[in-house]
Design a protein with these regions (language model features):
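Metal-dependent amide/peptide-bond hydrolase catalytic core
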Residues: 1-127
């Protein structure tokens, strides 16, 4: 779930392929195409986003202990360049966003807008 882990997995795959090739007396070659980099939040920005979300929906509705997921995102490139946090705005049950039957829950739009407005208010308070 990070670049070191990714490199370790690639090296391990190469070792397995080499071992199998040696066992069968053949030559083998692996090409690994790296996709998106891992999406890794900056801890302070993730905490900041959780605080803003708690302001909007209450801390009991904010889950900051989600298990890491293997998915990657183009936002990963932004997180490599700048501190930040990628989060998931819960929209209830149903298919995932990349599923062809995905149906956006319009009822969460005001909640999402309130969250993003709160992020701005916390980052740039009016004095």
């Amino acid at each position: 779930l990070d670049k070191a882990g990714q490199a370790k997995a690639v090296k391990r795959k190469e070792g397995i392929i080499e071992g199998q090739a040696n066992a069968y007396g053949i030559e083998a070659h692996m090409e690994f195409e790296y996709g998106y980099p891992p999406t890794i939040n900056t801890p302070s920005e993730a905490a900041f986003a959780m605080e803003a979300a708690s302001d909007v929906v209450g801390a009991d509705h904010v889950d900051g202990d989600k298990e890491p997921v293997m998915g990657a995102e183009d936002f990963s490139y932004m997180l490599e360049a700048r501190p930040g946090a990628y989060l998931m705005l819960g929209q209830g049950e149903g298919t995932g966003v990349h599923h062809p039957e995905y149906n956006f829950n319009d009822e969460i739009a005001p909640l999402g807008a309130s969250f993003f407005a709160r992020l701005v208010e916390r980052a740039q308070p009016v004095t």
